[in-house]
Amino acid sequence: AYDATRDADGHPYGGRYFLAPSKADMERLVAAEREWSSRKDADLRVQWPREELPFAYMTHQANFALPEQGYTHWYTMFNPRQLVDHATLLRAVVTGQASEAVKHQALGAVQQYLRNNNGFAIWNIQADKLEPFFSNSNYAPKDRFIENSVFGVLGRGNWLSCAEGIVEGVSWMAR
């Protein structure tokens, strides 16, 4: 959460702080579950993976066998709110009126956003920040689950920061 007064008073983190979920937050989660249920086989039906996780050493044998932890399909790595966000962003990219080159660049931002918003991203206590999926090479289920705001302007892993990385890359390439 953010509090401008705390920011103006000089509190640590520029007025940002962790906030326990409120009743309204829980209602938003329920609303996201309902939205996902109503849209997943309608307008978003081709924007999410239904495939089972392929058998591989890192997913089925090493560390934690993901199917034994409840992760049987790619979509099980996301909660319903994340699935709505991801599928909606992906749909906007693939159905948009942009050129193929711009769509490919936007897909790069979607890929980065996926890394930062899933059930395997964590809060890194030592570094005091979100760490995206594949920060290391294991698929171990996480005990410090974190979720950020899709369109927030602060922090790592929101849509803005993921899209900015693509813009920076294109600018660098044009030098």
Which sequence ranges carry the predicted segments?
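Nucleic-acid modification enzymes, centered on SAM-dependent nucleic-acid methyltransferases
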Residues: 1-175
